[in-house]
């Protein structure tokens, strides 16, 4: 006989909010790998990437990213499902792309679980906000070009009456701006940054599917990047890096070419 399912009177199982990293399985943490093996159920969305999801047996995988017909699964359902499984004594991994606490709604889920009396543990992951630009050859800081970095979401809560992102303040910082999930809103914030005083020729790099086998990188400026996005067909998930550091990739490729090296 298999292990009996715990009753509601038994201690609940633990929910682990696990960051899977930017997509390359080799960039997952050792602890994340171990928990995926030990978990009874893995609740995931699409961001962990096909190579990582492919390592999880189908029998213990549940996709809470989308429903049939393409609609997003409501957050309320995910919250409810985590609690339901934990109260049945299951060890649950809530698998997220990147890091659970970087625009991943990990904070909201942690509070909900605590409110319901469910043990919860956070397992940090390598955030795509840093790893994505890194694998594309775009440093976020550089002694000659940027001494600060700002991370911004390009996909805010649609119920907000107005954006909480102050593009004018970001334009005035002079550092690097990294926009996650920002492909769709690119025209709006590129225009907002120029209107706020950023030079139209400020370099921009778009990194699509960072660290995945089909990763692509496109570069331009605030003035040209929307046309570049459309021409190259850059689609989500993608990261935008705005600032002088975004030109580093092309400089390095030119140096390698002139030196006879491989890009």
Task: Identify the residue ranges that each predicted region occupies.
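Class I S-adenosyl-L-methionine
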Residues: 1-25, 30-126, 131, 226
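Short, glycine/charged-enriched secondary-structure capping and boundary segments
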Residues: 31-34, 56-59, 77-78, 107-111, ...
């Amino acid at each position: 006989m298999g292990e009996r399912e715990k009753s509601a009177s038994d201690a609940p199982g633990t929910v682990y909010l696990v960051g899977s990293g930017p997509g390359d399985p080799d960039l997952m943490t050792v602890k994340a790998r171990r928990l995926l093996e030990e978990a009874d159920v893995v609740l995931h969305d699409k961001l962990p990437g096909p190579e990582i999801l492919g390592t999880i047996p189908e029998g213990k995988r549940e996709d809470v990213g989308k429903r049939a017909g393409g609609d997003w699964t409501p957050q309320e359902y995910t919250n409810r499902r985590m609690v339901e499984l934990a109260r049945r004594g299951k060890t649950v991994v809530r698998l997220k792309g990147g890091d659970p606490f970087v625009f991943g709604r990990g904070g909201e889920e942690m509070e909900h679980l605590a409110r319901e009396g469910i043990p919860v543990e956070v397992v940090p992951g390598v955030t795509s906000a840093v790893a994505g630009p890194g694998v594309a050859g775009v440093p976020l800081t550089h002694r000659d070009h940027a001494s600060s970095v700002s991370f911004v979401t390009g996909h805010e809560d649609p119920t907000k009456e107005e954006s909480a992102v102050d593009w004018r303040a970001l334009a005035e910082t002079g550092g690097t701006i990294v926009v996650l999930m920002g492909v769709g809103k690119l025209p709006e914030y590129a225009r907002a940054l120029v209107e706020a005083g950023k030079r139209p020729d400020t370099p921009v790099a778009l990194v699509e599917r960072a660290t995945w086998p089909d990763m692509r990188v496109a570069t331009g400026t605030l003035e040209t990047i929307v046309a570049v996005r459309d021409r190259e067909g850059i689609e989500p998930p993608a990261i935008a890096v705005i600032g002088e550091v975004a030109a580093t990739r092309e400089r390095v490729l030119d140096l390698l070419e002139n030196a006879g090296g491989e890009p």
